[in-house]
Amino acid sequence: MPVIRFCDGSQQVYKHSVSLREIIENKKPNIIRSLIAISVNNSFSNFNTLITEDSSISFISKKDCEALNIIRYSCIQLLNYAAKKTWPSCKIGESEITKSGFYCDIDFENSITEEDFFILENNMKTLIKREYFISHQNISFDHAYEMFKKKSEIYKIHLIKKYINKKNKISLYYHENYFDIDMGMQVFNIKFCKYFKLQKIGGIYWKGDHKNKMLQRIYGTAWSTKKELDKHLSYINELKKRDHRKIGKLLNLYHMQKESPGMIFWHNNGWIIFNELEIFVREKLKEYKYKEVKTPLLIDKSIWQKSGHWDNYQDAIFTTSSENREYCIKPMNCPGHVQIFNCGLKSYRDLPIRMAEFGSCHRNESSGSLHGLMRIRNFTQDDAHIFCTQEQLRYEINNCIKMIYDLYSTFNFKKILVKFSTRPKKRIGDESVWDQAEKDLSDVLIENNLKFEHQEGEGAFYGPKIEFVLQDSLDRNWQCGTIQLDFYLPIRLRSFYIDEHNHQKIPIIIHRAILGSIERFIGILIEEFSGKLPTWLSPIQVVILSITDSHINYVKKIVQHFSDINIRVESDLRNEKIGFKIREHTLRQIPYILICGEKEIKSKKISVRTRNGYNLGIIDIDCFIKKLQKEIFTRSFYQMEE
């Protein structure tokens, strides 16, 4: 007499063995159509499973929160199955679900391209039309090993040998005659996987090691309904339109090339944006009483060994040598700032010392992880380190928070998420020091009325931290700002100051970043504004168009006037239709398009249009300049008449 317990807490007693189909028809007949998976005692089951003993049963429909992961795990095996049917010699590597879909790593004899997606997708759809049932089996380690060995699945053999105990059973899912290791529960019938789309392909070294073979990673997305899939694809299309790599090329901002992977070739337009951001941050540094410094690009390896960076980050550090000495190309600025602090005796009266740098840093990121401006090997940190006493700590944290929000407000980000990371299991320092540091950080956040997410155990081994995450208009999160306490580095690099009792004391270091990486922040801004940067950041702020050749001299005169007062201006004197010119410069995202014809010359005025299509009419030149200068000077987010 099996007792069946359901996930809603109810239970039912059956006088004899009973199939899952009977249980469903008795208990929840209305969910059969939407049912995608059934779990018996936390294991996969199907309609025909016979229950002979007391069991716990969960019915999973499309509406349940775990449904998406179940569909996506099923799509992973479906993709691998279709790949094996299409290219029988391919070898299946690792696969995983993602936030919006899944990916599969596959070793093909000959590389496939995105054009092959059409073939692969069609084969997946053909398999779905069969509406085959997915089955599940637990077998011995040795049996599974022999099965994968017979198929020459070298990557699967590696995975089971490394991650599965030989004494344990191995769980396999079967899609018809194709089997694979159980990564997560799957649907009981493949028909529930029809709302999917293959999206892109990339390269990935096996196990992330460049010494291993390069596999191809296929990314896909999968959803419960067509509506959800269409919504996601629409979102992806919007992302493609905003892609900073595409817009960067269109606006002639920068380029990258294979001879210098992960490095930026800034063109004049892009370098203007870079410099304007640097000028803006530099003004704030002065306002908040920071001292700007510059540290060397090459520093002897011994400094990085003393600081602990070599032990923890050496794989990411580029090195070079000269005259039998080994140097590190700096991956971060902090050890260099400590060297400046250590130069000369410091008194408690000298503290706090707020030291800032636009530091050019290099990190040896894997080639597969590089992505436009967002993930590069050479980047500029708007980095600062504050050397202070325990008594000054709260004020300095508060000052950092104020500065961070001051800068972010200029860019009109609607939502800033705050995360507070506390002590990890592996850490240095006394518990009392950690207690006080965490209290200082959390108290300052509370005093500033900032809601924050606790990230238990996510702090660095040398101190707790606060992260500031920008949420853009597409609800993507970008971690930019950080406030990180450090009790460790000043000890390792022997930093001290003389206190009021003439004793040596170790300062606390606050690591502070706001933009994070200037290059990455530019990428974020380009995508947030779809290339329509605020006027103060726009490489060209005004373009002046002539209608005919007879208007050229008037245009040149105005261009010279604008240039003399430091407005970034261009002219377009080509003998083209005015509508064509307007469209072209609108696509270039130039904030203001000025038109000069007979009417404008006679009135000694200009016709003004914005890149958003607003016609501001004929305006007095000095009046326009006054408004434009105010917009630029105040770093306004909005254009005239908006």
Curated annotation (Swiss-Prot):
Its EC number is 6.1.1.3. Residues 1-61 form the TGS domain. It catalyses: tRNA(Thr) + L-threonine + ATP = L-threonyl-tRNA(Thr) + AMP + diphosphate + H(+). Keywords: Aminoacyl-tRNA synthetase, ATP-binding, Cytoplasm, Ligase, Metal-binding, Nucleotide-binding, Protein biosynthesis, RNA-binding, tRNA-binding, Zinc. It is an enzyme of class 6 (ligase). Signal peptide: none annotated. Its cofactor is Zn(2+). Pfam families: HGTP_anticodon, tRNA-synt_2b, tRNA_SAD. The keyword Metal-binding applies. Catalyzes the attachment of threonine to tRNA(Thr) in a two-step reaction: L-threonine is first activated by ATP to form Thr-AMP and then transferred to the acceptor end of tRNA(Thr). Also edits incorrectly charged L-seryl-tRNA(Thr). PANTHER family: THREONINE--TRNA LIGASE, CHLOROPLASTIC_MITOCHONDRIAL 2, THREONINE-TRNA LIGASE. This is Threonine--tRNA ligase. It comes from Buchnera aphidicola subsp. Schizaphis graminum (strain Sg).
